[in-house]
Amino acid sequence: ISNVSITKGGFPARYGGRLSSVLEVNMKEGNMKEFHGDATVSLIASKMTVEGPLIKDKSSFMLSARRTYIDVLAKPFITNLNNQDPNLNVSPRYYFYDMNGKVNYKLGQYDRFYLSHFQGKDDFGLRSRDTYENGTERYESSIDFGLDWRNSITAARWNHQWSPKLFSNVTATRSQYVFNTRAISEELGYPNYPDTLGMSDERFAGLYFSGIEDYGARIDFDFALNPRHYIRYGANYTNHTFSPGATNLEFQSGGFNLDTTIGGDAVYSDEVYAFIEDEWKVNENLKMNGGLHFANLFVQGESYHSLQPRFGMNYSLPGGLAFKASYAEMMQFVNLLTNEGIGLPTDLWVPSTANIKPQTSQQIAAGLAKSVGPYKFSVEGYYKTMDNLVSYKEGASFLFSLDNDTWEDKISQGSGESYGMELFAQRKSGRTTGWIGYTLSWSYRQFDDINGGERYFFTYDRRHDLSVVASTDFTDNISFSGAWVYGTGRAVTLPEYSYYTGLPDGLSWWDGARALVDRPSDKNAYRMSPYHRLDISLSFKKEKKNYDRWW
């Protein structure tokens, strides 16, 4: 990665399709003259990068990869656990990996071609196998449960310079996100062991799949009209294939077999947008960025259209002070659903349809910034409203659902509101550098089908968020860095009391049975404990003949 930038407000017209933020990641292009590489080994993960020329001064490549090995480090402890009970074999599984690759090729004086690929996977689960044997009988049981999620994206880009003032990029992409869960239980019985006479077997498997696959094409133009106007314009097309969720159930017992799939109908949609924006240098003190983003979605015979104005300005005041302000309207056709009641990631992407309207937002922000020597200070406030947000209805879940409701029946749409302020201080040069950032914010949600229609704190509402980062070079070869983060605890719903209720006669094996029922609080009425973490690092550099070594 050569550069990462995040835009949380004041979105230029070239960005669209999301309400919250835009993360722009630029990959290294690879060295066209000589080979370089680096490798890092830490306590829980390793990574490596290599780059160099394919044809000197004409083409280059870059490859990088990383993987955690918590699963490998845990093996000795698991082996010791298994040795305590020879009939039990437990095998936990947790790791993630990702890989990046890029090829850069000069086609001529005015043309370049780029091909890049990324893929990553997180896997979490547990396998357990238990065996019982007494000489004449043998029984085996096994359990396998877990979840995994995978991402991949491939992009091909052609860059062409039409003139000293005009150049373009034509890009073709393919991306995919897949989320799986599994719960498998198997039992084998040999009552006349070692003979297989009378062998019994039973197997249950519950598998859940959700995903999204996109194919897209985009063209962008950058036009330096004159020293005061820099114009960007372009268009994009994306074909979405959504698999909102399919549950596959398998059950085998003796000669009885059941294999059925519930849900899984794909939803196809086409997204088209065009944009134009102008960076206008009005005078030496005032700079403005204005534009329009025109977005369209075609799905299930329905069409949605949105013309989104974007505006931003920066005005230099006396004394090195700068005032900035922005306004942006956004629309999002791809909706992220998160099951708030599960600690592990269960993010599901679902589309806007004829029944599910696209999410929209309006955001305004303003702030002041000042630079004093190596120091930079800023303060900014924002206010944002959101409509047609999506959430699970209370009690609804996509995982292993056996009812006849479609996934659309389990979604509620509502509104949201967020506002707050951010303080930031940074030292960018010198032997010691770093920054301090503090955010004070509020975030609310309101749905007719949730919390009795009353407004409540969003799950990720975080009143206070503080980050302190610093690094210093003691010498040319020894450096120290540290980062401390603090945040208000997550908003959660908890049971306030429990009570017994009677069950109807015939529902239980004895009449008069009772069930214990929890009475939950209002939605997100409680807070988890505040979260804080301190990371420190001490690095030693040793220069070798052909390479540098860090520890």
Task: Locate the predicted segments by residue.
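Flexible loop and strand-edge segments within Gram-negative outer membrane beta-barrel domains
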Residues: 110-161, 176-211
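Outer membrane beta-barrel strand-and-loop segments of large Gram-negative receptors
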Residues: 214-216, 263-267, 273, 353, ...
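Transmembrane beta-barrel wall of Gram-negative outer-membrane proteins
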Residues: 44-67, 86-126, 146-170, 225-226
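N-terminal periplasmic accessory domains that precede
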Residues: 1, 9, 14-37, 48
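Structural signature of Gram-negative outer-membrane beta-barrels, strongest in the C-terminal barrel
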Residues: 212-214, 224-230, 236, 263-386, ...
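Conserved C-terminal beta-signal and adjacent last beta-strands/turns
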Residues: 51, 104-106, 362, 458-551
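Surface-exposed extracellular loop regions of Gram-negative outer-membrane beta-barrel proteins
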Residues: 123-125, 130, 134, 178, ...
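Gram-negative outer-membrane beta-barrel transporters
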Residues: 285, 383-385, 404-494
